[in-house]
């Protein structure tokens, strides 16, 4: 089952952004986490497409986050790069690289 640890809501330029975060241990690239990450990313991509199609001004941004990326995550949140989807945690990079090997 998928139970995000926290949500952050930000209103900007008439759009409600919902940042959905699941916190994991550093380097926890288990098969279970690979599957959760893959399906959660797809779920939120599909949801965002449906919201756009229905002209609903909401967007969901999903991240797996671990302690070694906390500082960078909050810096990207503070300066707006997170809303532009320019952030990827170390754990996400590891999950993606191992997923495509």
Positions of PLM-derived features:
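Electrostatic, structured charged patches in enzyme active sites and in nucleic-acid/phosphate-binding
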Residues: 1-101
């Amino acid at each position: 089952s998928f139970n995000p640890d926290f949500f952050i809501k930000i209103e900007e330029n008439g759009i409600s952004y919902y940042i959905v975060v699941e916190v994991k241990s550093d380097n926890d690239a288990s098969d279970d986490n690979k599957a959760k990450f893959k399906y959660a990313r797809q779920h939120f991509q599909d949801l965002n497409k449906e919201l756009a199609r229905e002209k609903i001004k909401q967007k969901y941004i999903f991240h797996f986050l671990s302690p070694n990326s906390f500082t960078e995550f909050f810096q990207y949140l503070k300066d707006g790069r997170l809303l532009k989807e320019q952030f990827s945690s170390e754990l996400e990079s590891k999950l993606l690289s191992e997923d495509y090997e």
